[in-house]
Design a protein with these regions (language model features):
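FIC/Doc superfamily catalytic core
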Residues: 1-245
Length: 245
């Protein structure tokens, strides 16, 4: 489902509608990939009623609440140039009040070497991060047009750099959201139905530089999201009319 930045900002002002459903759908899957225990119903309760249901760690509660705020910030930032200061702000919003806020410099590149559990992948050293991210962002911002493959390539390179001490997966998927909005590409929410395929395709791309499988997973996730949001087709058509008037 294609929704550009302007339309998404318009939709954000319509209560009890597609914006909230999309927000829940995107965040549920993205957070679940990182071990969040919130169900969709519990996430919706937190969003709409500011109530926490279920048994969750304090950090999970705080970071889930923060992710709702980051989503809105990403929408607000769509259309603006992607740079490290924007990423710093997203990371600070995501991690404020968590354990990481107490022991790490949130909203900054990592200070200590980090690693991924269960995979043989060497991540960038802290001293390398600023230069690598400068090159990644510069090359992306110089593109005259952005394709799904460009988004996949950016994603695997970002995750291989792993520029923050923690929270890289979530920030990386927020970047995907921003990119899709800005280039009128069908939105991507990494559905947990394709969790293993996503992880395997991401790892393959990071090891070989071949993002073909990752593009395939993105397409599956696009189709899955389309199916879930089909009920809003008429609303989106009406919004198009309203925005032209």
């Amino acid at each position: 489902m294609k929704i550009n930045s302007k339309k998404m900002k318009y939709l954000s002002k319509i209560t009890n509608s597609i914006y909230e459903d999309l927000k829940i759908e995107f965040l549920y899957h993205s957070n679940h990939l990182e071990g969040s225990t919130f169900s969709k119903d519990e996430l919706e309760k937190l969003l709409t009623e500011k109530k926490v249901e279920g048994s969750h760690s304090l950090d999970d509660i705080i970071e889930t609440k923060n992710s709702l705020e980051v989503f809105d910030q990403v929408i607000n930032d769509s259309g603006e140039k992607l740079d490290k200061f924007m990423l710093f702000n997203w990371h600070k919003l995501l991690k404020k009040g968590t354990v990481d806020d107490e022991i790490h410099n949130i909203g900054m590149w990592k200070k200590y070497e980090n690693k991924l559990r269960g995979v043989d992948l060497k991540l960038a050293l802290p001293v390398e991060v600023d230069n690598l991210m400068f090159n990644l962002l510069s090359n992306y911002n110089e593109l005259e047009t952005v394709t799904l493959k460009d988004i996949a390539d950016f994603h695997y390179k970002f995750e291989k750099i792993h520029p923050f001490q923690d929270g890289n997966g979530r920030i990386g998927r927020f970047i995907i959201l921003k990119q899709c909005l800005e280039w009128n590409i069908d939105l991507i929410a990494i559905d947990d139905k394709y969790d293993d395929e996503y992880r395997n395709a991401l790892y393959k791309a990071q090891k070989t530089g071949d993002s073909e499988d990752l593009v395939t997973v993105f397409k599956k996730c696009q189709n899955r999201l389309d199916e879930k949001l089909e009920k809003y087709k008429n609303l989106l058509e009406q919004v198009d009319v309203d925005m032209q008037n």
